């Protein structure tokens, strides 16, 4: 049976029955977890797409029974072409290809997708990635988000994953500002009015010297 619901930030708030399969955006999953967390356990299999799943949401998903997957895809591929298990048994750091799809990298280390059943040509993305094998990859970040600081290329998304354990229910992100010496300097923005104790020592344990933010904004 197909269950139809109105578009909503919490599409299962009125749901009382078990659901075999559902699809949501990260924003919707966050809303469900904040408003009615027990409802999520009504879903057996959940795919999450439309935007990246950040480390804070992924940590919350470890507490639910639902089998959660992050999907990877784009308009050019028509639908998602890879999935990553986010929790439970077989949780993975890597996206795994759906059948008949393979991956490679271009000269900029961006993902190139081979989909012979959809197109005779490959699909080149702006997603910097690491190839595990021809059918799996690790997503690093967007090429246009790279911070070039003194000739060192830093990926904000990768750094955010590294330090996620320092932030509990606090949103944060890396960005950059112009710098006369470095070209760009790495900055960390924390969405909080209060400073976080032992943050500096925590960052030094998790980041290499060249990955340390030059400025921290609250």
Annotate each predicted stretch with a short phrase:
Residues 22-25, 46, 103, 127, ...:
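Residue-level signal for inorganic ion chemistry
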Residues 1-31, 69:
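AMP-binding/adenylate-forming
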Residues 126-211:
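AMP-binding/adenylate-forming catalytic core of the ANL superfamily
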Residues 25, 73-77, 125, 149:
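Ser/Thr-glycine-rich phosphate-binding loops at phosphate-binding pockets of nucleotides
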Residues 27, 51-52, 142:
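Alpha-helix/helix-capping structural signal
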Residues 34-90:
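Gly/Ser/Thr-rich phosphate-binding loop
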Residues 102-130, 136, 189-191:
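AMP-binding/adenylate-forming core of the ANL superfamily
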Residues 69-76, 95-96, 175-178:
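Beta-strand->loop->alpha-helix junctions that form or flank phosphate-binding loops
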């Amino acid at each position: 049976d197909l269950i139809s619901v109105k578009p909503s930030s919490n599409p299962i708030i009125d749901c009382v029955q078990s659901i075999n399969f559902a699809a949501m955006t990260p924003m919707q999953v966050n809303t469900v977890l904040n408003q009615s967390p027990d409802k999520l356990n009504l879903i057996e299999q959940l795919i999450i797409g439309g935007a990246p799943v950040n480390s804070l949401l992924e940590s919350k998903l470890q507490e639910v029974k639902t089998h959660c997957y992050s999907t990877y895809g784009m308009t050019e591929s028509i639908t998602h072409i890879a999935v990553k298990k986010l929790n439970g048994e077989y949780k993975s750091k890597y996206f795994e290809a759906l059948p008949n799809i393979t991956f490679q990298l271009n000269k900029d280390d961006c993902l190139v997708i081979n989909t012979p059943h959809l197109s005779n040509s490959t699909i080149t993305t702006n997603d910097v990635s690491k190839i595990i094998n021809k059918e799996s990859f690790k997503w690093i970040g967007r090429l246009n988000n790279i911070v070039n600081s003194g000739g060192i290329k830093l990926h904000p998304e990768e750094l955010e994953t590294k330090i996620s354990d320092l932030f509990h229910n606090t949103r944060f992100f890396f960005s950059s500002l112009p710098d006369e010496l470095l070209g760009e300097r790495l900055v960390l923005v924390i969405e909080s009015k209060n400073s976080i104790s032992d943050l500096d020592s925590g960052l030094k344990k998790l980041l290499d010297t060249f990955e340390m933010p030059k400025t921290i904004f609250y």
